[in-house]
């Protein structure tokens, strides 16, 4: 396995650990606009229903939070043109600290990204770093309805089970 593949696998495990520990419904390799020229795939999409007072009600789905993660192992991966699709209410770029520093030094604007997540020193969790271009007054980046987002999560999990 190449160093790039190993880095991607390590970052992916950390994303999966974070999604699972926060009790999100999630899937990896989630496709949108499948079969069209605009088809896009997001590395990880998670969903947590809105549950005030820990009670599920009819608005729990529409008011829930969708979180998108794009995993990039190195600069060539970042600039490859693949990925960097952010459709969630909250969006994260996940990368090694060295790539984050490169992007920061170059002043690369990260549109629609709330934070950059890098492995902690222990390598057991993800640590947030500021995204350049993030606007805290912007409440949500999501432009797709909850039913579509959830359906794509279901489809991605179904396709994975079939393979």
Regions found by a protein language model. Name each.
Residues 30-32, 48, 72-75:
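Short, flexible loop/turn elements at secondary-structure junctions
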